[in-house]
Regions:
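Long, compositionally biased intrinsically disordered regions
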Residues: 1-4, 222, 226-314, 318, ...
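Glycine-rich phosphate/pyrophosphate-binding loops
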Residues: 108-109, 122-145, 375
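Short acidic, glycine/serine/threonine-rich loops at helix termini
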Residues: 109-110, 145-152, 245-250
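A structural-propensity feature for long, helix-poor, extended segments
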Residues: 147-154, 385-416
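Low-complexity, highly charged intrinsically disordered N-terminal segments
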Residues: 18-79, 278, 284-285, 463-466, ...
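A glycine-rich helix N-cap at a beta->alpha junction
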Residues: 153-182
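N-terminal catalytic cores of NTP/NDP-binding nucleotidyl/phosphoryl-transfer enzymes
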Residues: 93-126
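A translation/RNA-centric and nucleic-acid-associated enzymatic feature enriched
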Residues: 277, 282-348, 354-365, 374, ...
Length: 540
């Protein structure tokens, strides 16, 4: 399916990865940042020396197993899944965790790339034989930014990026609480009308239609189905509410300390020239559910918390009591989310993208408040799928891969327009021909009336044909230019849609419709998770 894997250093794609970004320097100048992280991801062999820091006692492993095993077996009851879940009970078993919001039809491609990286990394670590590693995907179903996940993006038949939306309202609710109703069926109908019918279309929609109900249920069903042969353990945060009570208590009591640690680390990053990725306000790090919406609470007068718009209020003592009595009323912000994961799981490695890697650089001190160590932060694989239709355009215009990925085609596109506007050849040709016809007419007139009269019809005809040639030439060149500009625009939209990495925009099932269910395993065969560059997979 793929003919080659071209690897581009992130530093060669400055439009996506600025030279002063934490992410880029984490990959290419780790020594500058190693003090902000616990482990060096470059040396997997040394991970075994630190595994004791990430272990869990038997009773905590048992509690974790009881919380997540029935849920996973509901989606996939194979022996391999059971074995992976039961492995979590063993003292020498650790996890490789990653996660993402529950997007519509799994959301953008990079969601799958995170899962792929976790699976492949767990396999790689298992081959070393020092411990057992299980890949875990955290389906962030308590997030409430519905606008981020309520749509599917793809390239339509005209080469434009198109968005189709779920026709339902989020109303501030968590994704966990959003019922799809008829919204998913309508989305399927819209996609069927927009996507071309291929040999794989029926398979695609057969898989998709098995994931109805809640948006989070649909997401987990699809992730479980896509990775059923790779025994990916999936967890939703609501499964861990009871287990999270002690962590929530610490978070509540140390809320001010958490902010102090964050501020100190952020200041230290700023001093050496980095812009922090993680921002926060003085609100509590625990969200509170009120009327089915997540509410951020702010301390008021020392003994009460209120919502930002003051329409809800609760005393400190009542809030402290509800953390224990009603854990379902609480969820975690971006600061606490990894703390929950890495306290409840024996998590030695977290797989993250540019955003996560950057904000983990601010969290090392926060981990210490919870008496945990930050796991190894391992960069997820970053990919562009380069289809044959785009390879043809690339070859025609002699674009380099880096020019395309870094969306540096504007100059070349403008050069084509400039060449057309400066094209004087046909105008000069026509002017020369007309001047020669004028000379011929003058010479014929000197020879007498009979000569000029005999030549006039031919001269007029030639003059007419010269104008016709000029018009045809200019029209065809302009038409060709238009086609060329359209092709370049298609290329840009297909590889860097909306001037962003392809993996952040397009949905996997759009590609599966063209290339079939073997696409995902083929990608997993081709990628190199130990090469920390952007990888471009070329279709055969």
């Amino acid at each position: 399916m793929f003919s080659q894997n071209v690897k581009i250093p992130y530093s060669h794609i400055p439009s996506f990865y600025p030279q002063d970004s934490i992410f880029l320097n984490y990959l290419e100048s780790f020594e500058q940042l190693k003090g902000f992280y616990e482990l060096d991801y470059h040396d997997l062999n040394k991970l075994s020396e630190s595994l004791g820091d990430y272990s869990l006692p038997a009773n905590e492993r048992e509690g974790l197993y009881q919380a997540i095993a029935p849920y996973n077996l509901k989606f996939n009851s194979s022996q391999r899944v059971k074995a992976n879940l039961e492995a979590l009970l063993e003292d020498n078993c650790y996890t490789v965790c990653t996660g993402q919001q529950c997007g519509t039809l799994t959301g953008p491609l990079y969601t799958l790339y995170k899962a792929m990286t976790a699976i492949l990394l767990a396999d790689l670590l298992n081959q070393k034989g020092t411990a057992r590693f299980v890949p875990v995907f955290w389906a962030a179903s308590e997030d409430h930014d519905f606008a981020e996940v309520n749509h599917v993006n793809f390239l339509n038949q005209y080469g434009d990026v198109e968005h189709l939306f779920l026709d339902i309202e989020g109303n501030g609710r968590s994704i966990l609480d959003i019922d799809l109703g008829n919204g998913l069926s309508q989305l399927f109908n819209d996609l069927k009308a927009k996507w071309p019918k291929t040999d794989f279309t029926d398979q695609v929609f057969s898989l998709l239609q098995g994931g109805e109900g809640k948006l989070s249920d649909s997401f987990v069903h699809l992730m479980s189905s896509l990775f059923k042969d790779y025994v990916l353990v999936i967890v939703e945060p609501y499964l861990l509410r009871e287990l999270s009570i002690p962590i929530n208590q610490i978070a509540f009591e140390k809320d001010i300390d958490i902010h102090k640690e964050l501020q100190q680390t952020t200041d230290n990053l700023s001093k050496i020239g980095y812009t922090p990725a993680l921002y926060w306000d003085e609100g509590m790090n625990l969200f509170y559910y009120h009327n089915q919406a997540r509410v951020k609470l702010y301390k008021e007068n020392g003994d009460r918390f209120t919502s930002k718009n003051k329409d809800f209020s609760i005393s400190v003592d009542e809030l402290r009591d509800q953390i224990v009595r009603s854990p379902e009323l609480f969820s975690h912000n971006v600061i606490l989310r990894p703390i929950i994961q890495d306290t409840l799981f024996p998590n030695a490695v977290t797989v993250g993208g540019p955003g996560e890697i950057s904000y983990f650089g601010q969290l090392k001190g926060v981990y210490k408040l919870f008496q945990r160590k930050m796991p190894m932060i391992y960069p997820r694989v970053s990919l562009t799928l380069f289809e044959k239709k785009f390879q043809k355009i690339q070859k025609r215009f002699h674009f380099s891969i880096e020019e395309i990925i870094d969306h540096d085609l504007e100059a070349k596109s403008q050069a084509m327009v400039d060449d057309f506007e400066k094209d004087q050849f046909v105008t000069d040709f026509a002017d020369t021909m007309k001047k020669e016809l004028e000379r011929l007419t003058e010479e014929a007139e000197k020879k007498g009336k009979a000569v000029i009269d005999s030549l006039k019809p031919s001269i007029r005809k030639i003059d007419f044909e010269v104008d016709k040639i000029k018009d045809k030439y200019l029209k065809k060149v302009e038409e060709t230019l238009g086609i060329s500009k359209n092709q370049v625009e298609r290329l840009k939209n297909g590889i860097t849609p909306q001037l962003k990495p392809q993996e952040r925009i397009f949905n996997y099932f759009y590609f599966m419709n063209f290339h079939g269910p073997s696409l995902l395993p083929e990608i997993m065969k081709q990628v190199d998770i130990t090469d920390f560059t952007h990888q471009v997979l070329f279709y055969e």
